[in-house]
Amino acid sequence: MHKKHTDLGEQSEVEVYGARVHNLKNIDVSFPRNELVVITGLSGSGKSSLAFDTIYAEGQRRYMETFSAYSRQFMGGMERPDVDKVSGLSPVIAIEQKTTSKNPRSTVGTITEIYDFMRLLFARAGEAYSYVTGKRMERMSEDQILNTILKQFDEQPINILAPVVKGRKGHYRELFEQIRKQGYLKVRLDGEILDLRPKMQADRYKIHDIEIVVDRLLVAEADKKRLNTSIQTALKLAKGIIKISDQANQEYFFSKFLMDPESGISYDEPQPNTFSFNSPYGACERCNGLGTIFEVDQASVIPNPKLSIMQGGLAPLGEYREIWIFQILKALAKQYNFSLSTPLKDISQELIDIILNGSDDVLTVPVAYNSWNVKNYQIEFEGIIKLLEEQHERRGEEAMADLENFRSIKPCPECEGARLKKESLNFKVADKNIYELACMDIAQLAAWFTELETRLSDKQNVIAKEILKEIRARIGFLLDVGLNYLTLDRTAKTLSGGEAQRIRLATQIGSQLVNVLYILDEPSIGLHQRDNNRLIAALKNLRDIGNSVLVVEHDKDMIMEADHVIDMGPAAGVHGGQVVAQGSPAQLMKAHTLTTDYLNGTKAIEVPKKRRKGNGKTLVLDKASGNNLKNVTANFPLGTLIGVTGVSGSGKSTLIAETIYPILNHHFFRAKKKPMPYGSIKGLEHIDKVIEIDQTPIGRTPRSNPSTYTGVFSDIRNLFVQLPEAKIRGYKPGRFSFNVKGGRCETSQGAGLKIIEMNFLPDVQVPCEECGGRRYNRETLEVRYRGKSISDVLDMSIEEAVEFFEPIPAIYRKIKTLQDVGLGYITLGQSSTTLSGGEAQRVKLATELSKKDTGNTFYILDEPTTGLHFEDINVLLGVLNRLVDHGNTVLVIEHNLDVIKVADWVIDLGPEGGAGGGEILFQGTPEALVSCERSHTGRFLKAAL
């Protein structure tokens, strides 16, 4: 057993009294502190309601209470959860599955702070190299400069020059005047020494180099004092750089800063922000540190070059109308001598570039307000895309999204995707620059840092000692949570929910906080069985340093390794919300609950008696090479249940979500997203559509609910319109909608609730006093079908609705599928925002199932078992098998062995993640996979079969 950390006088348990959030049935529950506690139970049984909406919400609210009332009103309310009392609570940190930020500047390196420590390492211990000659840069003290000049130019006449302008245009009248007033007599302009005279100026449009001639002297030991004074003056004038020219007009540079003595380029002293792509001091100026640039995609803007601009040849603009943008194009046509009626294919490419991207010339645009009032506007034309952007920005985000269709993302030509200035990329530690390190996967990076001391100088080792300790610790934690295949430059928005969550977990372990209650939501998502033990060890590590760890989890290993388990149930939704068993895993096994039945083998997901062979047709993807895929060829037998497996990072999502799905989506629905590179695809003619079912919420507003999402609400409204009472009153379907005026309660605008703003207290939702929470006005509610009003129907659970609507096939079919996927407990009008990820996914599944079946559909599900209990998985597999039995193809990306063992065909990728993956190790039946030596999946599947 691990050592317990309990302070004297401290409560040893977290106690929750009277929890009633969502479906919790006024429960009292307690669990030990400083232990690993798992909450398990069916999807919808109240696990998240207890862990996140009660315990975490209360901890968060207490933290908010510490702020002043004035600050709280700006923070948005933290509602007090519906619970009588929570005691023994430490500060809470929740690590959820919500994918991290959509910010393109957020990367694995910045989230874990490894990149920040690497910036510090490069700023303090990096060596600079010239980007011109590749030689190591030097810096000298004033004494070293003096001694070098004495030695190198002994008994030779030299000019001591202070460079003040390097490679820039301008007439520099003021500069020459300023130098003259300081008492200098000569300057060197573009290599030629000239006398300074009043009103002197250079050619304004040429690029110039200007140096002040500080002194001309014969170098000799006797003149050392004069030489020293001149050097110091020149260094001051030119901010630390001086130039020497000898008799032969050869030039030599010296600097107090980092400098290349051959080419004369110098770098500023490196600071940590020199290596930050989020700082103007480090970011590449072309792409502002993003590594990519948007380019106008000419083919999308001009899809049909046979049309003229008047006929709508420019897709974003459409046909000619009397609007400002066309007035500008008229003026442009006049200036460049072309016609808006000419087909675009007959206009030169040079002019097309000007139309799209603009030019430096000033345009005169005449605008006629009426026949006698014409005004001329002078504008700089920046191209139609830029103009549209400005207009769209005023119209909000959706309009900006339309514009994305006309632009494509390309790697920045300046930094080639490295995000940094060339100066920053020429600082090296042990022959690697910071971008080269950011491109290594975590496993390679760990190896590189292990041997680093032997490759550094003594001075570098002293400086780097503490930094290396921090970097190694953080890399170690990433390895512990199974993320060895990620690279530091991977952007946060490309991470899956499970990866993002485990990165946050590694960051938390890295912070080494103690006396905290961590609450995690299924950290094993997207994690292969192989890495499970490491994850459990990482959670135990958090516990052993003195924290409480509360995990919502369905994974068998995690449940059995916990110190304490809370099993919620007995069923889901209104039938759940109670603690059916709790205690150590050993105590739990003695109880009789759905969970324990699956744990001790009383119940199990059966292996099918025989595998389906499919319909004999195959979809073949050839030579897929996106991300880490190594030119793989994948066979998808149609009419089967296909499982795509492999360790995390082996290339499953690249193969399916980024290659196969975009290809099919483009083929059937002309979708814009480009697939990753591949050779060819055969067999598309055997499929008639593709459907992807993921776990994103089905609606983000309280007005969205299962009946509106599945479309059954329209049928129900049409039914109510057919009723005699509705016909007499002349009601249309809109009368029964709570989203439009007419039949809804106008006081609450059909929400049934009023939100009362409480300034610095959380907003309070109260039932609307007009309709009493029923959403509709009195007249609408008077129309009844079999004694029920439209509001009563929305309050029915799916189970009740199935019985109620049995006589009406159109409605019955849609509601029955919701019951078939195991959602009998939710109500028709339940707000989508209250559904869990697993529930939302099943609403989508039911929606697809209720559609007329063509029997040739290709379904793609990415980890459908997320958030599902063993019993839920059984129900889900029943649904998927039904789809396949109708002739459809169902493809699941999955780690769950219960799903893999019932698949007809398995495609296993690997053998490792990242660069070590990307091969297809095996394609065939689960039985044959077991004997594949290189496959980690096969090893674990053996036990399941």
Question: Where do the protein language model's features map onto the residues?
Answer:
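Conserved phosphate-binding elements of NTP-dependent enzyme cores
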Residues: 1-945
